[in-house]
Amino acid sequence: MFQGASALTLDAKGRMSVPARYREALQGQAEGRVTVTKHPDGCLLLFPRPEWEVFRAKIAALPMDAHWWRRIFLGNAMDVDLDSAGRILVSPELRMAAGLEKEVMLLGMGSHFELWDSQTYIAKEQAAMAQGMPDALKNFTF
């Protein structure tokens, strides 16, 4: 289970050091294998490979009228492995798609991660908070 936010930096080659608290889980759960793809909100999704296979099967089973969503999620997916220093390489294509340059935010989302450009994430989070709670959370107890 992945949770929490980590402010990270991409190096000149587009590599991101995975926080130590996640490395052991990724090694144990997925032998260090991760799949990265686009998300329509403007971030990237990072899945441990077994979780990716579950997600991939759901996307592949979508009806024909969702063929563009298959292209977005599956057509842009790239398999990567943690290197010996605990880093993953984010491809130039995916970095460009999510506007990632140097400062990024990695968010644990349970079974997977979201990877955001730091400034984009801050702006979207502030906009969401300014809108107030959605109806789905109105009766939620904190």
Swiss-Prot record:
Pfam family, one: MraZ
Disulfide linkage: none
GO (cellular component) term, any one: nucleoid
Gene Ontology biological-process annotations: negative regulation of DNA-templated transcription initiation
Signal peptide annotation: none
MF annotations from Gene Ontology: DNA-binding transcription factor activity; transcription cis-regulatory region binding
Subcellular location: Cytoplasm, Nucleoid
Gene3D superfamilies: Transcriptional regulator MraZ domain (3.40.1550.20)
Domain of life: Bacteria
Primary location group: cytoplasm
UniProt domain SpoVT-AbrB: residue ranges: 5-51, 77-120
Keywords: Cytoplasm, DNA-binding, Repeat, Transcription, Transcription regulation
Description of how the protein assembles with itself and partners: Forms oligomers.
Family named by the database record: Belongs to the MraZ family.
HAMAP family noted in UniProt: MraZ (MF_01008)
Protein name from the UniProt record: Transcriptional regulator MraZ
